[in-house]
Amino acid sequence: MTADEVGKNSFAKKEEQVLKFWKDNQIFEKSLQNRQGKTLYSFYDGPPFATGLPHYGHLLASTIKDVVGRYATMDGYYVPRRFGWDCHGVPVEYEVEKSLSLTAPGAIEDFGIASFNEECRKIVFRYVHEWEYYINRIGRWVDFSSTWKTMDASFMESVWWVFQSLYNQGLVYEGTKVVPFSTALGTPLSNFEASQNYKEVDDPSLVVRMPLQNDSASLLVWTTTPWTLPSNMAIAVGETLVYVRIQDKKSGEQWILSQGCVSRWFSNPEEFVILESFSGKDLVGRTYEPPFTFFQSKREEGAFRVIAASFVEESEGTGVVHMAPAFGEGDFLVCKENHVPLVCPVDAHGSFTEEIPQYQGQYIKHADKEIIKFLKKEGRIFYHGTVKHRYPFCWRTDTPLIYKAVNSWFVAVEKIKDKMLRANSSIHWVPEHIQEGRFGKWLEGARDWAISRNRYWGTPIPIWKSADGEILVVGSIRELEELTGTQITDIHRHFIDDLNIVKDGKPFHRIPYVFDCWFDSGAMPYAQNHYPFENQKETEEAFPADFIAEGLDQTRGWFYTLTVISAILFDRPAFRNAIVNGIILAEDGNKMSKRLNNYPSPKYVLDTYGADALRLYLLHSVVVKAEDLRFSDKGIEGVLKQILLPLTNVLSFFNTYAELYGFDPKSQDIEPAYTEIDQWILSNLYSVVGKVRESMSQYHLNFAVEPFVTFIDDLTNWYIRRCRRRFWEAEDTPDRRAAFSTLYEVLTVFCKVIAPFVPFLAEDIYQKLKLEKEPESVHLCDFPQVEMDKILPDLEKRMHDIREIVGLGHSLRKEHKLKVRQPLANFYVVGSKDRLSLLKTFEGLIAEELNVKNVIFYEEAPSFIYTTVKPNFRMLGKKVGSKMKEVQKALSELPNNAIDKLIQEETWVLTIDDREIALDGDDVVICRHTDPGYIARSSALFSVILDCQLREPLIVEGIARELVNKINTMRRNQQLHVSDRIALRIKTTEAVHRAFLDYENYICEETLIIAYDFTQDSDFQGENWDINGHATQIEITVSSIDS
């Protein structure tokens, strides 16, 4: 396969064929059947909403989940993979509201809750076919035939059981708290929902005068929320902070603020004078005039006083804090402690109520300008500017959140914090830092969870309440049927809101709330199986899950809610192992945006490059380590061309010559006569098996991918290249049989190693190689075991050194524009005695690989190369100080052998004036110098020198090799079969003609020429080539002459 074919979507087309093979032959189903009765490997899948299309984040998560599931299955486990759907909540409601224009306050109630909920039910699976297409197309195996849905009555009933269990443990309560609130949705949100969508915004920055009663001074109060000023109830100071009374020299006006904030607001000391200083404690209890008079009657209840608060700081503002207890969590708690009254003149949609007649009906953020205008007119504004800061936005509507005091139902998470931390300590996180970092810190700061929502399409909270406050919590459908005497088939709001319970003659009515949809997903381990009403054994055996995987944002979402509920119910984690992936960004580093069109569509990528390339690109990146990835389809194309295409070419190479020479793996009865390079590639193969197994046991997917990516390079750029002629041998020799047997074993084992990661290509390779009685699919095979008897560490080390030496030689040729096809005379290798003694048996291999006539090994550098060492002044300055000149002189006088020894030992100790100075590699700059005609390069272990002086015999041989290259290029371009013999016509210079004749046998054997003709015919129209500076025309035709 050529690079041109990459553009023809050949990989994607092959993948479509593999998908059909899997479907037609029910390979996924068979993979499950084959492991029935084996050890269960439990996996929980985070449910997506089907009201939106899948994006790269979903494809990434699907890839991670699929890799682990496929690997565990091949490793002998039974891995059920059941898909689930998140059906409730704001994402669904919001779509219906938009489509039906139900945006005005009260519009849903006017439309009818029953009608609204049924509309929600209709659109839940709007994009289910697209989801199934992308999940299947990415190669993920999952069971869509028995999906669970959060809107199913069975699921919702289990959620009720979970809630009743929490309530019975005394961990559910009703209360008023300040919580994140979405005015677009008219409902409170949880702390973790509020943390998901912070943005940089510009807000007003106001310093407001608050005149003290019975005093000529005003307190200077800073705020970024002018809309909260009508609700001001108190002012807070820090008891231990020092405050100052400042007087303006010109106007005589006096202000009070904290001493540490003076320079922020008074930059010119010539314009003011500090009259006195005192502690914050001295201000506590003082009264002041609020900026608005709407709640003057509250003064009698304790409003408009200065109170102390521990959170008051001097890092920003004035050290004097405006308190609106209904709109700040800290304000609420401190005001409650100090018996300051609570007012909340803002409705559920963020508009001022009739309590603020001046701005009644205005949306609070829109009222900011009017409020500032009024306060300026009243002379209350000391400073007006803007401030840029991070502010939370609603994760669904993308509108600013507010913090608002609301009545809500809470789970007392703070009471079970120790249980959650204990559960977290037993989870294996990838990456590891999530445990003590992002997730652990979130658990340490966990707040009580507001679980009630003033919404409609969700699981109703099963609380019935009497007029005197008595509560009944229902835990099952049967229990509700018995309490109401009604047969129940659905428990959504419009089916049960009107069901009243009468107990001991007292009526109970259901509270009008539904659960936060995160409560649904947190109950998923139990609710997916309708636990505890059925499937008890299966659910308990599968708990905790062996594995889950989601994005970094879920450390404050699904990972968190799973942990809260499992810690309460069972005092255990909900999962044992978790992979946390990062965020996929557009190539420019911004969020992917349809509006900005800054990323290629998933369908385009899958249709152009295929799923394997996308999977490997993602798995071989930082995104599987919870870091962000800038997505680039060029990166996917690189994976295709540099990793998958070379492996496909190896398969094509093997099949071509195996078919040509009739290689039959079943007929290989005796142990092949393996050469050292055969033993090396097999050793390398089984080392890779071990590395992949070890990495997968730790859930390090990127580490699992790395060794097999490197192995593909070893296989294609070393083993195949070094052994090509062995496969071309016309005679059936033991050496040819060993080469075929080796490569057959490599491909049949390696396709199983890569099967979890690139399942399509693995299947393609397997199908082209599998024997009749072997499993039907590579995914029905066992994952390879490590064959320790084939692992030869010393041989791998030696070959690594050889490749390093050859790599240095190739780098020299490339740097100095010396084609490898041009033979050179000598290649020198300088290294330690121990290493060189193991490499001398590979002298011929190095010579052939680098196209040199002689390879010479030296333990010390030869006379035509010398090394100098200079100080790295930037690094050495701190270490040697005034001794720099002496160090520079000592380094310049070191002889070659001493320098080589120091390089190998990687330690440098110089004695300057009886003082020992220890240097390391960063402290010096090593420079290699050679005589004219030689070029050199070094690594940590070796130095190599290439004799690049061209003599006549070498020039002639270079021409011959160039001819071979160009003729074989023409063979490939004309798509000749590897066995086709050809006739050659050539028009060229005398030098090329002479080189051809000198190397006739070599050229004819390498290109399968059986007849040739040199012509000077002026009408000859061959293909034009430059043969080392000689203009040449060449024509080749398939010859009919029997070879």
From Swiss-Prot:
Protein name, entry field: Isoleucine--tRNA ligase
Cofactor(s) this protein cannot do without: Zn(2+)
Protein family (similarity comment): Belongs to the class-I aminoacyl-tRNA synthetase family. IleS type 2 subfamily.
Any Gene Ontology biological process: isoleucyl-tRNA aminoacylation
Key words of the record: Aminoacyl-tRNA synthetase, ATP-binding, Cytoplasm, Ligase, Metal-binding, Nucleotide-binding, Protein biosynthesis, Zinc
Record's GO cellular component terms: cytoplasm
Any Pfam family matching the protein: tRNA-synt_1
GO molecular function, one term: tRNA binding
NCBIfam families according to UniProt: ileS (TIGR00392)
Superkingdom assignment: Bacteria
